[in-house]
Amino acid sequence: MLKRLRSTHPMLYCLVAEVLFLGMLFVASLLSLLLILFVVRDIDAVDDYMLTFMQETAGVLVAWLFLARTGKGGLLRRRGSGFFNGLLVGLYPIALISYNAYNTLLFGRPEGDMLPAWHVVWFLIGMTSVGVAEEFLFRGVIAQTLLEHFGTSRAGVWKACLLSGLYFGAAHLTNLTGSAPLGVLMQCVFAASLGTLLAAVYFRTGNIWVTVFIHAAMDITSMLIGGLYGTETVADSISTYDITMLTSIAVYLIPTAFLLRKKKLSEVELYFGRDMK
């Protein structure tokens, strides 16, 4: 049924995949809390990022099931350009991540000691699991489906990138339950632009683990002080976003245009031509 829906109504298929993914995250969050309350009986003793990992593991499972049931599980093993060559393609976001991490650690560290090592480990694991789950779904399931629908022409690749970015941005509306509305709206704009760039990197490399690495590194960097020192939560961080986040449209779409310049589109055909109908 999923394979037929994907073939005949690809955009509806993408919407169904996203809704089920987000729904599973919500259910997994509730079940994790109930399990912890039953076993530990003290929710304050449990690290928030441990809960994130448990939640995102359920998301990974949903995305993998969509890939497996539609015959696309092999995407997770596809080498494409290779991981390290792919990192060169994604050098721009990696440079941004490195700069932000350096700037944060140099100028943004609060007074006081870091959290215990086990908290930091859960922070790294939790944020990495977000990157894995979201890349499996938004690039492996959604961007891949849209590319196969629109084709590997220049217009087709751009449509797949932009539309998958919009799906990615819209998913962050779920943060309205815990963060300020303006912050969430700005996060959606930021995420839509970033999702467009990550789709371009995925299409240029044919290797989903490249975007998993970039996404996880970006999430870790964005919460670096909170994760190392416990000074803020993800919800607190989102609430601080303001209209300056609109600059992300240019920050991410200009390099997207560079990655998808005409002479490089043959690489998309090389890695994904076999998937076209």
Language-model segment annotations:
Residues 22-29, 94-102, 165-174, 216-227:
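Aromatic-anchored segments of alpha-helical transmembrane domains
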Residues 15-69, 83-93, 117-122, 126, ...:
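Alpha-helical transmembrane segments in multi-pass membrane proteins
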Residues 184-241:
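Functionally important transmembrane alpha-helices
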Residues 1-10:
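Short, Lys/Arg-rich, polar N-terminal cytosolic tail immediately upstream
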Residues 216-277:
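C-terminal membrane module of polytopic membrane proteins
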Residues 65-73, 101-104, 203, 254-264:
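Structural signal for the C-terminal ends of transmembrane alpha-helices
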Residues 136-163, 200-207:
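Membrane-interface helix/loop boundary segments of multi-pass membrane proteins
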Residues 9, 42-58, 152-164, 207, ...:
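Membrane-interface starts of transmembrane alpha-helices
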